[in-house]
Amino acid sequence: IGGYWGGVSTLSPQFAHLLPAQVQPTPTKSLLEVEPALLWDAASLFGVGNINPGRLTEFYHGMHGYLAASGVDGVKVDGQSGLTAFAWPEGAGGSTGHGGTSSMVRAHVHAMEASVSE
């Protein structure tokens, strides 16, 4: 959700309860050495609308509920490693920060797993 298509809208009333913030990626130096184009891709130039980490379970529960009600019984989860470049900004949306790299991926994976287990 946080990656290739710009994330969620930070201006949409439908997402307001999820407290999204526009977040700029911070690719590691070693990643930029092998993929320098990351400095000028759309996410780097414009940021990505990320959901407040405290609202991830709510987001995935809503999305999975909608998909299940529509008859979808499976999804492919892809691109999770793209979340490693996004740290939740200190103080954004009432957050006290959520780090980046593995902690951001872990938060998303745990929220997805909790959502589909219901």
For the regions a language model picked out, list residue spans one by one.
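Aromatic- and carboxylate-enriched substrate-binding clefts and catalytic-loop regions
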Residues: 1-118
